[in-house]
Amino acid sequence: MVFEPVINSHKIKFKLLDKMFSDFYFVSDRVNIFINLDSILSEFYREDLISSFMNLKGYENIALSSEIMNIAAHYRKYFYTRHKKTTFIYFYYMNKKPKKNMVIYPDYCKSIIERKNIKGKYEVFNNILKDNLRLLSLLSMYVPQVYFLLSDGYEPSLVPYNIMNNSICDNIVLTKDPYEYQFVSYPNTYVLRLKYDKSVLLNRKNLIDYILKDNKYKPNNYIDGIIYELILPYLSCKKRDLKGIKGKGKVNIIKKIDKLITNKKFPKFEDLSFNSLYKILDLDVDYDEIKSLYTITNISYQYNRLSKKDKINLEEFLIDRYENRTIMQINSTYYLNNPVQLIELWEGVQY
């Protein structure tokens, strides 16, 4: 089946998860897990898969929805069987252009938007995806504490941030998008960077080392990952089609920060703001240009500019129906070859 290899690559083996969470301090009995669907689905936009999608028959066309739901089953089972934690799982997806950010930066998320064009070369997959997302939305209504949320024209990362902002528990974001690495700056929040057996649980302590892993340069001083959300406006971000500031890449910026720390000219990381870092770095970058990039790259800044109505809209699809018979009937009728793992999805559920 064409969907399984990609989906299974996002299910980290329990053995590796055990290493990640062996000394993990949980702040409550609840864990929020946010799954960036665009990050996963981007792997299906490949020309070598087009013929495979065209050859799908019957119920094979809707197998993607059950495979995605089983990602939730995988992580729910892990956190309950290994750590006795109740999980709330949120799939989130960019269904509309992030208009506010595109006004400031017209090419923002351009590649994501173009590949979703129903009339383009990925027309077959987009039609399959449309049906599967509709089914995923339906399934999530009947599975306890699993939700499918749409961005509806907002920056997609605001969807998980809105929920994080209203709950005191551990938050784990499953993503491959460097834009979202900034989530490590927020309380009790971690990024699970998915990459088969090389997957990494990112936090404030290891983020800077991780983004420099392919570079020869290594800082002499500890650099807190909290800085990432402040330097992101300077950096390129392929996932969002952000070109960054020429000549001001991550190595150059972190080198400068490292030198300032050595010379005792750098403040506490917690005391930094966008403006103070801009002055300290003194990189000969136009303030208005970098500030405009900050307004579309900093998640907390964007969130603070939302109205109450906007925040309510972000929660529109938080629906629970809890009808066991309905979900069992759907499973036995449509997903015989790729069943939804219902037993795992009910692990540790609290009513």
Where in this protein do the model-derived segments appear?
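Non-catalytic, usually N-terminal nucleic-acid engagement modules in DNA/RNA processing proteins
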Residues: 1-113
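Long, highly charged low-complexity segments enriched in Glu/Asp and Lys/Arg with interspersed Ser/Thr
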Residues: 325-351
